[in-house]
C-alpha cells in the first residue's frame, strides 16, 4: 500500500508544479482539459483575486496624486478668472467714466452757447418786422439819435443784477455804437436793427422785472421812433430819383392844375432829364390819360417855357408827337398824349401831375421821439 501511494503523491506534486508554473491558465505542456482546470478552482480563484487586488492597489495609489493636481489646477484657474473679472470691471468702469465725463463737458459747452429755440424765433421775427423801417433811415443825424437812445439803454442795463447778461448786453451795445458811428448805409442800419432786436430778446430773459420793464419801454419808444422816421414822399405820391410825383384822379384846366399843385407845396411837373421824361410818359400811357404838364407858350407864341421860367431845351423837342405842336385854335398848353407830347387848349379839363423834392429826413432831432407828423393831404383828386 505504501508503495502504491508514493507514485500517486509524486504525480500530484508534478501536477501542482505545472499549475503554478502556468498562471493565467497557461500550461507548458498545453491544456489538459476543462475538467482538469475546474478541478483546481480554489487555487485559480486565489491567484485571480491576488492579481486584481494588486492592480487595484496600484490604481488607488495614483488617485490622490491626480486629485491633488486637478485641485491645484482648478484653484489656479479660479484665481485667474477672479483677477481677470476685477481687471475687466475696473477697465470698463474707468473707460465709461471717462467717456461720460467727456460727453458732459462737450454738452455743457454746447448748451452754454446756444439760445433757446423760442428766443431764436422771436429774434428772427422781430428782425424781419423792423428791417424795412430801418432801411429807410438815410441820415446821419437820425443815426446819432438812435445812438443816444442806445446810450441811455446801456446805462439802464448796467444796473441789472445778472452779471453774465450785463456783459452780453454791454458787448452788443458796444458793437452797436461802432456800427452807428459808421453811418447811413442800409446794411449798417439793418445791422443796428438786428442788434436792437437781439438786445430786446436778451432783456426779456432778465430776472429783475422792474428794470426789464423800463428797458422794454425804451425799446418800444425807439422802435416807434424808427418807424416814424420820415418817408421820402407822402402817401399816394410816387418817388423817383429824389423827387415825389402826384398823379391826379380828377380833371382840371391847365391854370387850376397849377393852383392845385401849389396848395401842396409842389408845382405842375417840370421835366429836367430824359429819364424823368420816360418815367412820366410811362405813368401817363399806362393810365391812358391826357395829362397836363407845366409847359406852355402863353407868354410868346412858339416859345415854349416851363412854369419855373426855364426854357424848353432843344433836346426835348423830340418828345413832341408827329406834327406837334401845331397851335390849332390857340393850343398853348402841353400835355402827355399817347407816347409823346401834344399842345391843346389851356381851358380844357385834363388830369395833371404835381412834382416836389423828396424829404431829406434831416429835421430837428426832437422829431425822433415826438408824435408822428401828419401826412400832407394830396391835392384834391
UniProtKB/Swiss-Prot annotation:
It comes from the Eukaryota. It is found in: Membrane. It holds the Pfam family Lectin_C. Residues 96-303 are annotated as: 6 X approximate tandem repeats. A motif (Endocytosis signal) lies at residues 14-15, 16-18, 31-34. One of its GO terms (cellular component) is membrane. CDD domains: CLECT_DC-SIGN_like. Its main location: membrane. Residues 59-381 are extracellular. Residues 360-381 are annotated as: Disordered. It is a single-pass type II membrane protein. The chain crosses the membrane at residues 38-58. GO terms for biological process: adaptive immune response; cell adhesion; endocytosis; innate immune response. Sequence repeats lie at residues 96-118, 119-141, 142-164, 165-187, 188-210, 211-234. Glycans are attached at residue 80. Residues 240-355 form the C-type lectin domain. Homotetramer. Interacts with C1QBP; the interaction is indicative for a C1q:C1QBP:CD209 signaling complex. Interacts with ICAM2 and ICAM3 by binding to mannose-like carbohydrates. Interacts (via C-type lectin domain) with CEACAM1 (via Lewis X moieties); this interaction is regulated by the glycosylation pattern of CEACAM1 on cell types and regulates contact between dendritic cells and neutrophils. Pathogen-recognition receptor expressed on the surface of immature dendritic cells (DCs) and involved in initiation of primary immune response. Thought to mediate the endocytosis of pathogens which are subsequently degraded in lysosomal compartments. The receptor returns to the cell membrane surface and the pathogen-derived antigens are presented to resting T-cells via MHC class II proteins to initiate the adaptive immune response. Probably recognizes in a calcium-dependent manner high mannose N-linked oligosaccharides in a variety of pathogen antigens. In vitro, is a receptor for HIV-1, HIV-2 and SIV and transmits viruses to permissive T-cells. This is CD209 antigen.
Amino acid at each position: 500500500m505504501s508503495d502504491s501511494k508514493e507514485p500517486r503523491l509524486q504525480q500530484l506534486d508534478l501536477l501542482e508544479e505545472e499549475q503554478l508554473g502556468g498562471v493565467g491558465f497557461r500550461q507548458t505542456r498545453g491544456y489538459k482539459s476543462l475538467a482538469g482546470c475546474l478541478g483546481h478552482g480554489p487555487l485559480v480563484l486565489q491567484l485571480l483575486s491576488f492579481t486584481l487586488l494588486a492592480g487595484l492597489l496600484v490604481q488607488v495609489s495614483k488617485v490622490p496624486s491626480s486629485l491633488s493636481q486637478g485641485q491645484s489646477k482648478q484653484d489656479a484657474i479660479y484665481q485667474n478668472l477672479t483677477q481677470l473679472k476685477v481687471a475687466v470691471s475696473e477697465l470698463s468702469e474707468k473707460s465709461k467714466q471717462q467717456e461720460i465725463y467727456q460727453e458732459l463737458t462737450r454738452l455743457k459747452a454746447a448748451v452754454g452757447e446756444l439760445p433757446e429755440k423760442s428766443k431764436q424765433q422771436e429774434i428772427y421775427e422781430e428782425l424781419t418786422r423792423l428791417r424795412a423801417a430801418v432801411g429807410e433811415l438815410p441820415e446821419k443825424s437820425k443815426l446819432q439819435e438812435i445812438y443816444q437812445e442806445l446810450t441811455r439803454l446801456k446805462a439802464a442795463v448796467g444796473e441789472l443784477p445778472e452779471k453774465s447778461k450785463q456783459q452780453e448786453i454791454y458787448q452788443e451795445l458796444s458793437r452797436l455804437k461802432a456800427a452807428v458811428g459808421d453811418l447811413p448805409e442800409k446794411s449798417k442800419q439793418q445791422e443796428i436793427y438786428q442788434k436792437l432786436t437781439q438786445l430786446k430778446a436778451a432783456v426779456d430773459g432778465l430776472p429783475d422785472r422792474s428794470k426789464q420793464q423800463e428797458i422794454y419801454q425804451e425799446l418800444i419808444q425807439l422802435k416807434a421812433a424808427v418807424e416814424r422816421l420820415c418817408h421820402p414822399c407822402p402817401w399816394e405820391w410816387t418817388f423817383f430819383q429824389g423827387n415825389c410825383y402826384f398823379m391826379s384822379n380828377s380833371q382840371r384846366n391847365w391854370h387850376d392844375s397849377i393852383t392845385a399843385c401849389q396848395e401842396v407845396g409842389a408845382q405842375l411837373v417840370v421835366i429836367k432829364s430824359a429819364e424823368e421824361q420816360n418815367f412820366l410818359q410811362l405813368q401817363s400811357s399806362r393810365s391812358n390819360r391826357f395829362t397836363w404838364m407845366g409847359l406852355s407858350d402863353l407868354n410868346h407864341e412858339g416859345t415854349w417855357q416851363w412854369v419855373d421860367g426855364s426854357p424848353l431845351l432843344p433836346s426835348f423837342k423830340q418828345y413832341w408827337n408827329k406834327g406837334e405842336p401845331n397851335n390849332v385854335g390857340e393850343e398853348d398848353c402841353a400835355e402827355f398824349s399817347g407816347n409823346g407830347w401834344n399842345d391843346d387848349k389851356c381851358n380844357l379839363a385834363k388830369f395833371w401831375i404835381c412834382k416836389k423834392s423828396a424829404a431829406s429826413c434831416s429835421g430837428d432831432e426832437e422829431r425822433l421821439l415826438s408824435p408822428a407828423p401828419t401826412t400832407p393831404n394830396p391835392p384834391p383828386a
